[in-house]
Structures are given as C-alpha cells and as structure tokens.
Amino acid sequence: EPMNSNDPAYILYTSGTTGAPKGIVRDVGGHIVALKWSMKNIYNINPGDIWWSASDIGWVVGHSYIVYAPLFHGCTTIIYEGKPVGTPDAGSFWRVISEYNVKSLFTAPTAFRAIKKEDPEGKFFKKYDLSKFEILFLAGERADPDTIKWAENLLKKPVIDHWWQTET
C-alpha cells in the first residue's frame, strides 16, 4: 500500500544516559532523502561504489547504512557477520576491505580499539591490498585520540570521527 512521505518509518529512542530516553520519529520521505544525500555529500560514495557499514543491523546506523542508504543510492553494500577480531583473527576487516574493494568503512571506534589491542603493529593489515580504500568513518561512541591516531598511522588515509542525531 502506498505511503505518504510524512508517514512514520520508525521511532528511534536515545539511550537515556543523560536523562529519560527520548523518542525521535523518523518519517519515510525525509529519512530516505537524508540517507541518499549523505551517501554522496558526507561519505563521497557514488552509485556503483562499494560501501561497508560494519554495524549491528538492529541499530539505526545498521539498518540505515547497511540496507536503506546503499539501496537508494545504487551502491554495493557489504553485509558482514562477525567481529573485528576472532572471526578468525584481527585481520578480518582488512580481508573484507581487500576482497571486495571497499571504498569506505563506517564503524564504531570499539571495533578499531579491538583490532589495535589484538594487532598493535598492524601485521594483519600488511597482508592485504587496500589500495581501493579511501576513508574510515567512526561514530556511535567517543573515539579516543589514541585510536584515531593509530588508525591514521596504519591506514595513511583520513579517519573521520563524526556524530549523529541521538549522540548530540
């Protein structure tokens, strides 16, 4: 059945860490427009590019940037089951980026803290060709300066820490 652009898509609740949780209603049309716009204007992803949002699909970033945004923007999305370490090792993210020629990765800082802890020298990183990889985006929680610097030094690419609606 057709929907109006202002029909609710879902309600997103803040964590409540600074008070009672607050519900944010996302409308269908506005959310789709914002997601499509952000793929080009924030993430520099073009139709046909390969994008990876390494998030839980149940979180807002997960369903928004694993499913909806890539679908509406016409790019390839990576759906990954596993953790950044231990599935099978701390090179899992590098293997996926290399194997699928990922242009940009969006993940939580915790993922990179885990990789850094397991492989501080970046030995797994050196095993893979990441020549197509351009930029790392971190969000969802505080990105500590040590983790950002470690990722920048390892990747030799920009590492962007940014915030979203319920984090501000």
Model segments located where?
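Conserved pre-ATP/AMP-binding loop-to-beta segment of ANL
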Residues: 1-13, 20, 35, 44-50, ...
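Conserved short alpha-helical elements in the N-terminal third of ANL/AMP-binding
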Residues: 62-78
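Conserved adenylate-forming
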Residues: 47-48, 82-168
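Adenylate-forming
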Residues: 31-32
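Residue(s) in the substrate-gating loop at a strand-loop-helix junction
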Residues: 56
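Short functional hotspots where side chains directly engage DNA or cofactors
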Residues: 14, 25
